[in-house]
Amino acid sequence: MYNKRKIKRQTMQTSTKITGFKKLWLIFILAFMSAVAPLSTDMYLPALSRVQEAFATSEFFTQHSLASFFIAFALGQLIYGPLSDFFGRKKPLIIGIALFMSASLGCVMVDNVAHFIALRFLEALGGCAGVVIARAIVNDLFELREAAAVFALMMVVSSLAPMLSPTFGGFLLQLFSWESIFISLFLLGIALLLFVIFTLKESHEPHKESFDFKAITSRYKDVLKDRPFIIYTLSSGFALGAMFAYITGSSFVFIKYFGLHEQVYALVFGANSLGFMILSIINARLVFWCQPRTLLGLGLALMCAFSLLLMFFDSFWLFEGALFCAIACLGFIAPNAVTLAMSRFKEHSGTASAMLGTTQFTLAGIISFGVGAYGANTPWQLGLVIFACSALAAGFFFAFIKKSA
C-alpha cells in the first residue's frame, strides 16, 4: 500500500508543468527511446542475406534471429515495468540501454549463428526498456489530455524510424559490411545513454516496500482486473495488428498484384506513414478540445469504414486511397488508447505499461505471422485481415467500454 506522503509526492510530480524547449527535448528523448525496436529490426532487414552468407547458414536460421528479437522484446517489457515502479525509472533504463549496447557490439564479434541469435535476444531484452519506461514517464509527468498530446507527438517522431531505417541500413551496406549496422546501433545506444544520464530527470520516486515475486504478481493482478485497461489495451492491440498485417502483406499486393516497381512501392509506403503522422499531429491539438475517448471512438469507427472498402476495391488508386485513410486513423487510435489505458494506473505506471506493450506486441506479432504464413496476396485478402482487426478493435471498445467506465 502507498502512504499519503508517497501519493502526495507523485501528485506533485504529475502536476509539474513542463513547457517550451524542455518539453520538446523530453518528447525527443522519449521518442528516441521508443524507436529502438524499428531501428534494430528495419536497419537489419537489408542485411539478412549478408548475415546468412557470413555465417554460412540457411535462411531459416537468419529468420530465427528476427524471431528471437521479437520474443525478447515482448517478454522483456514484463521485467522492466515492475523494476521501474520499485527502483525509479532511470536505473532500469540505464541498465537496459547498457545491455542493448553490449549486445549490439557483440553481434559484430561472434563467429557462429547460434551466438548471433543469442545476442539478438539480449539486444532486444535491453532495447525494450526504453519503450516500456517511456510510456511510464509520460504517465508520471502529464495529466490525461496533455499525455495524449505528448504520446501523439512521440509517435510522430518515432514513426520516422521505420520510414528511414531500411534506407539507412541499405546505405551502410553499400559503403561497408553488415557489421556496420550493429556498430551504428551501438553508437546510437551511446548517444541515448548520455541523453538519459545527463538530461532526463527521475520522474518516479523508488518505493521502500520489498521487491519480490509476490509484490510483482500482486501488481499484475491489479492491472488484469481493471476492465477498462484491458479494453483499451485490446482495442489498441488489434488496431496495431491491422497495421502489422498491412506491413507484412502490402508488398505482395502492391508489387505482385498491382505491378508497382519496388521504388514506387517505397514511396506509397512512405505516403501511408505520412497520413498516420498528420493525424497524430492533429490529434495532439484536438485532445485539448475533445475527450481522448471521443477521438479514440471516432478513429476506430473511421478505420472500420475505410478498411471495409478495401475488400471491394480492385483498382490501385481506390485501394490505396482507402488504405491511406485506414492507416491514418491510427493517429487518433494509438495515442489515445495508450493514454486512457495508462491513466488507470498512476501509482504503478511501469507495470501497466509493461502489460500494455507486451499485449500489443504479442497480438501484432501473431497477426503478422498469420499473414506471412498463410498469405494475403490480393487486395480482397489483405482488406479482409485489416477489416477483421479493425472490427475487433472497435467491437471491444463500443460493446464494453460504457459498461466498464
Regions flagged by a language model, labelled:
Residues 197-221:
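Flexible cytoplasmic inter-helical loops of multi-pass small-molecule transporters
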Residues 342-380, 385-386:
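A late C-terminal transmembrane helix in Major Facilitator Superfamily
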